[in-house]
Amino acid sequence: MTILNSFPSIFVPLVGLVFPAMAMASLFLYLEKNKIL
């Protein structure tokens, strides 16, 4: 828990938004590749 407290409050929402965004983008590109093929 000390590790979570040492991070700034911005770190959690940043990861919460960036990680899903990257996952959605990679999934979108994967589906687009399959459509082209």
Curated annotation (Swiss-Prot):
Its main location: plastid. The chain crosses the membrane at residues 10-30. GO terms for cellular component: chloroplast thylakoid membrane; photosystem I. InterPro entries: PSI_PsaI, PSI_PsaI_sf. The keyword Nuclease does not apply. Keywords: Chloroplast, Membrane, Photosynthesis, Photosystem I, Plastid, Thylakoid, Transmembrane, Transmembrane helix. It is a single-pass membrane protein. One of its GO terms (biological process) is photosynthesis. It is found in: Plastid, Chloroplast thylakoid membrane. Belongs to the PsaI family. May help in the organization of the PsaL subunit. This is Photosystem I reaction center subunit VIII. The gene is psaI.
